[in-house]
From Swiss-Prot:
<dbReference type="GO" id="GO:0005840">
    <property type="term" value="C:ribosome"/>
</dbReference>
<feature type="compositionally biased region" description="Polar residues">
    <location>
        <begin position="41"/>
        <end position="52"/>
    </location>
</feature>
<dbReference type="GO" id="GO:0006412">
    <property type="term" value="P:translation"/>
</dbReference>
<protein>
    <recommendedName>
        <fullName>Large ribosomal subunit protein uL4</fullName>
    </recommendedName>
</protein>
<dbReference type="GO" id="GO:1990904">
    <property type="term" value="C:ribonucleoprotein complex"/>
</dbReference>
<keyword id="KW-0687">Ribonucleoprotein</keyword>
<dbReference type="GO" id="GO:0003735">
    <property type="term" value="F:structural constituent of ribosome"/>
</dbReference>
<dbReference type="InterPro" id="IPR002136">
    <property type="entry name" value="Ribosomal_uL4"/>
</dbReference>
<dbReference type="Pfam" id="PF00573">
    <property type="entry name" value="Ribosomal_L4"/>
</dbReference>
<dbReference type="GO" id="GO:0019843">
    <property type="term" value="F:rRNA binding"/>
</dbReference>
<keyword id="KW-0689">Ribosomal protein</keyword>
<keyword id="KW-0699">rRNA-binding</keyword>
<keyword id="KW-0694">RNA-binding</keyword>
<feature type="region of interest" description="Disordered">
    <location>
        <begin position="41"/>
        <end position="78"/>
    </location>
</feature>
<comment type="similarity">
    <text>Belongs to the universal ribosomal protein uL4 family.</text>
</comment>
<comment type="function">
    <text>Forms part of the polypeptide exit tunnel.</text>
</comment>
<dbReference type="InterPro" id="IPR013005">
    <property type="entry name" value="Ribosomal_uL4-like"/>
</dbReference>
């Protein structure tokens, strides 16, 4: 169990929140998180890269010149891989890169990744009411009050993404906005700081519990 200080919109400490997640054993933690990370990045590949072989390129059915007597090198097709405009040898073809991982393993990896970033976790009160209209400047100022440098990558975890929060955060390149039930290993690991509302933390506890 981990106790986290809760900060309000002004950056003042107003309470504590607890987070209790079942994580992987220390000797297995790095391995299972790595597997989940590789799976996520691999499954993001489209796998649509495609080239044509000499059999698929248009043309080249006729021998360009006779076999002997011209003094030129032998050639059987103008679509040989040696020729400009010819087919590609061993080029990419459409491929399914999908990697499977058991649901329990995925959740264990995500809990382990989140637990490894506890030192960089900042818990705040729900601030949806403070953003009565889309204001990027107000959100950035709040991040500063919460102790976040302007050059740090931030994952902002909320229970519900309101229009005002989304519009306030979308123009800031270093902010990644996520719902509590839509976390992923990559964003948790790559961020410098993780900011979560108290409601979102409870949602994480509920959604990603070991049950």
């Amino acid at each position: 169990m981990v106790n986290c200080i809760i900060k309000n919109w002004q950056g003042e400490e107003v309470g504590q929140a607890t987070l209790e997640l079942k994580v992987a054993k220390e000797e297995n933690a790095a391995h299972i998180v790595h597997r989940a990370l590789v799976r996520q990045q691999t499954n993001a590949r489209q796998g649509t890269a495609s080239t044509k072989t000499r059999a698929e390129v248009r043309g080249g059915g006729r021998k360009p010149w006779r076999q002997k007597g011209t003094g030129r090198a032998r050639a059987g097709s103008i679509r040989s891989p040696l020729w400009r405009g010819g087919g590609v040898t061993f080029g990419p073809k459409p491929k399914d890169f999908n990697v499977k991982m058991n649901r329990k393993e995925r959740r264990l990896a995500l809990r382990t990744a989140l637990d490894s970033r506890i030192e960089d976790l900042i818990v705040v009160e729900n601030f949806a009411e403070q953003l009565t209209q889309p204001k990027t400047k107000e959100l950035v100022s709040a991040l500063t009050r919460w102790g976040i440098d302007g050059n740090q990558k931030v994952v902002l975890i909320v229970s519900e993404i309101t229009d005002n929060i989304q519009l306030s955060a979308r123009n800031v390149p270093y902010i990644k906005l996520l719902k509590a039930d839509g976390l992923n290993v990559y964003d948790l690991l790559v961020a410098d700081k993780i900011v979560a509302t108290a409601e979102a933390l409870s949602k994480v506890q509920e959604v990603y519990s070991d049950s």
